[in-house]
């Protein structure tokens, strides 16, 4: 993961946590062991909803294993599952706001 991908990922994770999501970062050298190849960098949960986020630097390319993972989970998706590939924090924030609005997910901070 490049420095710019790390910066983007940190900003996305911070945004998710601010919105009350329980977040786990999965990005690590997984290909070495052959396990979890293609699995996104970030997984987040909130009120039964699951988000999978693959972080790319601007202009970064999606690997074949990441495309394959997206194809494999697609038939198992539900309205509560989103799998995003992003390199833009602002676009991600807008998509997250839209998802929460459309899914009636209330941000914890808005309840306080």
Feature roles, as predicted:
Residues 1-112:
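Catalytic phosphate/metal-binding cores of nucleic-acid and nucleotide-processing enzymes, i.e., regions
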């Amino acid at each position: 993961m490049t420095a710019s991908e790390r910066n983007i990922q940190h900003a996305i994770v911070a945004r998710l946590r601010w919105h009350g999501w329980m977040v786990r970062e999965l990005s690590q050298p997984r290909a070495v062991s052959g396990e979890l190849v293609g699995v996104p960098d970030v997984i987040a949960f909130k009120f039964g909803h699951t988000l999978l986020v693959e972080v790319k630097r601007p202009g970064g390319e999606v690997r074949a294993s990441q495309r394959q993972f997206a194809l494999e989970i697609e038939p198992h998706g539900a309205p509560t599952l989103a799998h995003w590939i992003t390199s833009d924090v602002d676009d991600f924030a807008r998509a997250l706001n839209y998802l929460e609005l459309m899914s009636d997910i209330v941000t914890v901070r808005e309840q306080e």
